[in-house]
Amino acid sequence: MLSRYIHIFLFFSYIIPKTFVGLSMNIKLEREKLILFTKVGAIVLTSIALLSASLMIYPDTAATLSNSLVHEKELPIYCVEQDKPLISISFDAAWGNEDTPKLLEILKKHNVKATFFMTGGWIQKYPDDVKAIAAGGHDLGNHSENHKHMSPISAEECKTELMKPHEKVKELTGKDMILFRPPYGDDNDTLIKVCRETGYYPIQWDVDSLDWKDYDAATIIRRVTEHKHLGNGSIILCHNGGKHTAEALDELLTTLKQKGYQLVPISQLIMKDNYTINTEGRQVK
């Protein structure tokens, strides 16, 4: 920071003399130039010293000034500030449905409501599964029409990717989806703004099961239940088509309950209004 002050002083020491170029070079004017330059230099250095001292005394002011000069990225919801031990488990559905009935059966056994993020293609291919998910009281979530990376596309294309599956689910179930998870977790400011404009809450996750890597059931369970970010307000990511996800789910839910967690759908975990999202992606009041 000191180097910045030096540069400012050097700037004034260069500019001020230049303003006098072309003026009479008599002794009186030269003396006035010197006096003026000295006064301005003293004022500048005094101001810099006072500013530096105030920023050290009031660091919050310094942070505010810094933040006002830096563009703040729009953030989705990765987790939620929660006093109670509430968490959510979610399943991305983009390919296959072989294990979906088993997942729903296990969720019902544990009286757990989950959130399913579905692509437009999956909705169209497996309409009965969509209806079964809705009938089970689970959240119906939007996972885009074509499961493409969202950050490179325009706002209009983002809107199309959101609204096509929205209309399909509305036609099948009569329900309006309000949760959107971008494929690959790929988001940017444009997408987040489109979500808000279309009535969606952009949702990510803070606990990844990595079930899509075909880890065995024991590894999936351990990854989730021992995850460093697992805590009140966590959102767990799984996939309905994971090779061992269905095999792991029963014990996973049992272990999470033994740890004292209550599982609720994401729509019940998040705040709907009067919130902000901090730099960690945590939704807070």
Stretches with model-predicted labels:
Residues T61, L69-D83, K109-N111, W122-Q124, ...:
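C-terminal domain-boundary segment and adjacent tail
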Residues N97-D99, K148-D176, D186-N232, H244-A248:
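Alpha-helical scaffold elements lining the catalytic groove of polysaccharide deacetylases
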Residues K113, D139, Y201, D208, ...:
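Residue-level detector of anion-binding/catalytic polar loops
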Residues A63-I153, E157-K168, T173, M177, ...:
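Active-site beta->alpha N-cap acidic-glycine motif
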Residues K39-M56:
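Hydrophobic membrane-insertion alpha-helices, especially the h-region
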Residues F91, M118-T119, E145, R181-G185, ...:
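Active-site-proximal beta-strand/loop segments in catalytic clefts of secreted hydrolases
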Residues L2-F37:
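N-terminal Lys/Arg-rich, disordered targeting/topogenic segments
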